[in-house]
C-alpha cells in the first residue's frame, strides 16, 4: 500500500491495523479487535481520556502499539509516553513499537536517524524535530513522571495484584495517576488498558475524574447483568445481542476464545477470578468473595416493642434506598422492603450483644437484636470509646 495514502489522513486506524496484523502474519483482526481500534483510533472523535477494559488475551497492547505507530505516521512530532506497573512491561511495549517501525516498509521513514535517540526505552522517529522529549518513552508508574511531556499517554496494565492489594496501595496508585495531568500536553490523549485486579479497582474510580470507560467482556452478558456495567459495555456488544441475535452467555470473540476454552479458564480461575479477568464484572466478584453484604439487609423504620408479621424482600432498582450513605463495597446497595404484611405484634425475644474493645483505639460496640417469625430486627446499636473500663461496661 502506497505510503501517500496514509499521509492523506483519510485512512482509518482499522485499515492500518489490518496491515499490521498482515505484517505479523496473524489472522485478520477480529470484530472485537476492530471495535477497540475504532474506539481509540480517531484522534478527532475518540475520547481524550479513554479506558479500554477488555478480557485477557484480546490483544489490547498490540492494538495500542499499532495505534502509536499510526499516530506517529500522521504526525511525527507527537510525543508518546508508555506507563506500566513495571518498567519491564513498559519497555516491552516500546520495544514492540520500535520493531514495527523498523520492520514495516510503510513505516521506514520513521526509523531513527544518525544522532537521534534509538533505544528500547527511549527513541525518536526520523522526521521529528529536535526536542527534549523523545518520540516514544517507557517508564514504570513508580518512576519519575515529573518533567516528562507527552501528547499521547498509554497506561498499560498499571494495576496489578502487587500494587492494589490494600486500600493504601490503591490510594498511592491513584495519586500517581494524577501526575498524568501535569505531563499531558494541551489537546493530548490518555488511554488506559487493563483488566480489574480487585473489587475496588482503580479503573472504577477514573470515570469520576473525567475518563470514559468502555468494556468488552468475554461473554455476552445476560440481560440481568447489563445494569452492573453501568452502561459502559461497548455498543457493539449490545447490538450483537439486540439486533444480530447472539445469545447471552456465548463468547463475544469466538475466534479468540471458544466456549470450551472459556469453560476451562473459568474452572481454572474460579468464578470470582473469571468475573474479574474475563467478564470485567467487579460487582459479581464482590458477591462471590464476601458472603455477608449490605444488600442482604432490609432498611425500614422499626418499633422497639412490635414488628410486622411478614416482610417481603426483593433486590429491585426501584427499592434502592439512596438516602443512607453507602459504606460497603462498590456495587452494594441498601434496599427497602417490597411489602409489609399482617399485623404489628410483640417481638418473641431480644438479645443484647456486646463486643468489648482491647486496649487499642477501637471501640466497645453493642447492638440490640429482636426476633419475630424467623426474622431478626436490629433496633439499636452503638459504640463507646474507653476499652473495657468500669465506666464503659457500666
What is each PLM-predicted segment?
Residues 83-145:
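Conserved nucleotide-state-sensing and coupling region of NTP-binding domains
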Residues 1-48:
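N-terminal accessory segments
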Residues 151, 193, 199-204, 256, ...:
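RNase H-like, metal-dependent nuclease domains and their acidic two-metal-ion catalytic environment used
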Residues 47-66:
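Walker A/P-loop
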Residues 202-290:
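Conserved P-loop NTPase catalytic core
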Residues 121-178:
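Conserved RecA-like ASCE ATPase "motif II neighborhood" in helicase/translocase motors
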Residues 64-75:
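Walker A/P-loop NTP-binding motif
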Amino acid at each position: 500500500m502506497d505510503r501517500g495514502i496514509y499521509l492523506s489522513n483519510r485512512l482509518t486506524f482499522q485499515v492500518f491495523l489490518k496491515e499490521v496484523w498482515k505484517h505479523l502474519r496473524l489472522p485478520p483482526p477480529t470484530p472485537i479487535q476492530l471495535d477497540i481500534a475504532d474506539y481509540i483510533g480517531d484522534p478527532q472523535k475518540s475520547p481524550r481520556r479513554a479506558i479500554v477494559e477488555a478480557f485477557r488475551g484480546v490483544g489490547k497492547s498490540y492494538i495500542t502499539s499499532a495505534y502509536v505507530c499510526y499516530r506517529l505516521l500522521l504526525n511525527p512530532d507527537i510525543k508518546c509516553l508508555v506507563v506500566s506497573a513495571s518498567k519491564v512491561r513498559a519497555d516491552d511495549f516500546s520495544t514492540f513499537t520500535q520493531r514495527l517501525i523498523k520492520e514495516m516498509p510503510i513505516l521506514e521513514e520513521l526509523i531513527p536517524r544518525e544522532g537521534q535517540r534509538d533505544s528500547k526505552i527511549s527513541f525518536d522517529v526520523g522526521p521529528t524535530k529536535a526536542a527534549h522529549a523523545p518520540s516514544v518513552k517507557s517508564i514504570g508508574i513508580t518512576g519519575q513522571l515529573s518533567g516528562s511531556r507527552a501528547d499521547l499517554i498509554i497506561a498499560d496494565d498499571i494495576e496489578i495484584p502487587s500494587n492494589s492489594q490494600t486500600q493504601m496501595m490503591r490510594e498511592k496508585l491513584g495519586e500517581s495517576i494524577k501526575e498524568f495531568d501535569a505531563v499531558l500536553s494541551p489537546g493530548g490523549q490518555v488511554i488506559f488498558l487493563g483488566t480489574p485486579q480487585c473489587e475496588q479497582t482503580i479503573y472504577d474510580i477514573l470515570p469520576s475524574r473525567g475518563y470514559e470507560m468502555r468494556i468488552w467482556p468475554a461473554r455476552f452478558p445476560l440481560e440481568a447483568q447489563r445494569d452492573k456495567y453501568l452502561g459502559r459495555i461497548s455498543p457493539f456488544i449490545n447490538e450483537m445481542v439486540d439486533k444480530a441475535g447472539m445469545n447471552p452467555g456465548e463468547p463475544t470473540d469466538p475466534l479468540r476464545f471458544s466456549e470450551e476454552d472459556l469453560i476451562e479458564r473459568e474452572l481454572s480461575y474460579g468464578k470470582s477470578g473469571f468475573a474479574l479477568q474475563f467478564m470485567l464484572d467487579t460487582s459479581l466478584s464482590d458477591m462471590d468473595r464476601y458472603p455477608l453484604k449490605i444488600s442482604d439487609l432490609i432498611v425500614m423504620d422499626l418499633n422497639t416493642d412490635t414488628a410486622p408479621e411478614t416482610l417481603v424482600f426483593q433486590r429491585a432498582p426501584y427499592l434502592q434506598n439512596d438516602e443512607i450513605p453507602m459504606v460497603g463495597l462498590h456495587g452494594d446497595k441498601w434496599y427497602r422492603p417490597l411489602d409489609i404484611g399482617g399485623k404489628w405484634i410483640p417481638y418473641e425475644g431480644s438479645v443484647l450483644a456486646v463486643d468489648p474493645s482491647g486496649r487499642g483505639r477501637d471501640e466497645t460496640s453493642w447492638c440490640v437484636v429482636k426476633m419475630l417469625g424467623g426474622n431478626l430486627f436490629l433496633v439499636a446499636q452503638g459504640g463507646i470509646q474507653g476499652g473495657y473500663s468500669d465506666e464503659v461496661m457500666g
